[in-house]
């Protein structure tokens, strides 16, 4: 019997289209002799749809027409109910479209990669691939991520963070702190977005103020980082769980300017988006053996201290002047699932998907061994509860 996989993608996110591309790549990679795949597309308005038409990327040009030929679906947040239901129940026949065995979220950015969707899956209790709620939330929030890494001895660049309200009430104080602790130039980032969305750099106070206003359009919390001017960017993926993980080969993305942009990552110099694998890169990266070993070690440590699971990609900065290596950030659901890094490491895409499914089922088995509730009902203990007939105080 085939394992029934639900692939969720799209979502209420600025990285919506990239999620679609990553998901279609993953769906195509699954061994259809072993798996029965159900695509579940989440619109930008948060509605869920399923249907074969979702498998053709050209259909996404006309969303209204696409939704008309697909089935609107939903799941019930009830533990143990793995059914995918039809929203518009037929007069005759089953209201259940299919029953899932495992879910793989291929959702990038907000409302999917940040722990929110993972929390829904935890509530249902269905096995799923990738990071859990805690790791996803920590990985998405750049501030929390930096705090965890810094406390664990993982090297990161100097930074300052603040909320949008603090910026309006304490602007001069914050600017003074930034100029004293970091100095220009700086990188300005929204705290909770990926794919380089909303990121820019500032060379002076005037530019800083303008760039913070841009970042505020995407997040209520802003991060200001020391900008390494003469840098080399390196990425390394990690596959496994906290007990058993391995790093991939390293890659060096090729950027068109000071910052690796959304276009650099996903357009690859072409006029049409093709996913993360389309970006221009060197694989393996041009590194000395010592730097390669150091980056792979730090990638694994970052994966471990953030309690990651499945496949993730850790992005690094090397200061060419000093040779220092810094962890920039982690992507807990990386673009294209970093399959191109694993192919270069000797693991084909279909085997990568096998590994993710096996890891999901392993975690479910292990979590089932933990105590989450007691069979004993304390309401039957009588004297153990204050209040008696009048209720609990």
Per-segment meaning from a language model:
Residues 37, 127-128, 156, 186, ...:
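Hydrophobic beta-strand scaffold residues
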Residues 3, 9-12, 286-393:
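ATP-dependent carboxylate activation and anion-phosphoryl transfer catalytic cores
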Residues 203-275, 286-291, 297, 325:
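Phosphate-binding site of ATP-dependent enzymes
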Residues 43-46, 240-243, 319-322:
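Short acidic-glycine loop/turn motifs at beta-strand connectors
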Residues 3-9, 13-14, 20-28, 93-97, ...:
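Active-site nucleotide/adenylate-binding loops and adjacent lid/helix of ATP-dependent enzymes
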Residues 1-134, 138-140, 144, 163-173:
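ATP-binding N-terminal substructure of ATP-dependent carboxylate-amine bond-forming enzymes
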């Amino acid at each position: 019997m085939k394992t029934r996989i639900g692939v969720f993608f799209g979502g209420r996110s600025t990285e919506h289209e990239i999620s679609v591309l990553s998901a279609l790549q993953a769906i195509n990679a699954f061994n259809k002799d072993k798996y029965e795949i159900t695509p579940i597309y989440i619109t930008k308005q948060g509605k869920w749809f399923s249907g074969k038409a979702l498998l053709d990327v050209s259909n996404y040009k006309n969303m209204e027409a696409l939704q008309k030929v697909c089935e609107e679906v939903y799941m019930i947040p009830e533990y143990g109910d793995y059914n995918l239901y039809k929203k518009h129940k037929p007069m005759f026949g089953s209201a259940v479209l299919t029953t899932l065995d495992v879910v793989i979220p291929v959702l990038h950015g907000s409302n999917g990669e940040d722990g929110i969707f993972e929390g829904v899956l935890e509530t249902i209790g269905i096995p799923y691939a990738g990071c859990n709620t805690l790791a996803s939330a920590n990985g998405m929030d750049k501030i929390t991520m930096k705090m965890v890494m810094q406390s664990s001895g993982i090297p990161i660049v100097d930074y300052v963070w603040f909320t949008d309200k603090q910026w309006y009430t304490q602007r001069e104080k914050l600017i003074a702190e930034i100029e004293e602790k970091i100095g220009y130039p700086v990188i300005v980032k929204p705290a909770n977005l990926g794919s380089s969305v909303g990121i820019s750099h500032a060379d002076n106070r005037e530019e800083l103020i303008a760039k913070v206003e841009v970042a505020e359009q995407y997040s209520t919390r802003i991060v200001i980082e020391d900008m390494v001017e003469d840098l080399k960017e390196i990425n390394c993926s990690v596959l496994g769980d906290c007990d058993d993980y391995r790093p991939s080969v390293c890659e060096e993305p090729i950027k068109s300017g000071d910052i690796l942009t959304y276009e650099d990552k996903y357009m690859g110099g072409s006029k049409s988006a093709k996913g993360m694998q389309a970006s221009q890169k060197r694989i393996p990266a041009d590194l000395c053996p010592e730097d390669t070993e150091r980056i792979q070690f730090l990638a694994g440590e970052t994966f471990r201290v953030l309690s990651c699971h499945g496949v993730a990609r850790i992005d690094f900065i090397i200061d060419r002047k000093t040779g220092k290596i810094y962890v920039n950030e982690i992507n807990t659901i990386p673009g294209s699932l970093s399959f191109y890094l694993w192919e270069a490491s000797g693991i084909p895409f279909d085997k990568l998907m096998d590994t993710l499914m096996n890891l999901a089922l392993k975690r479910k088995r292990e979590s089932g061994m933990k105590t989450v509730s007691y069979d004993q009902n304390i309401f039957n203990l009588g004297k153990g509860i204050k209040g008696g007939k009048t209720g609990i105080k």
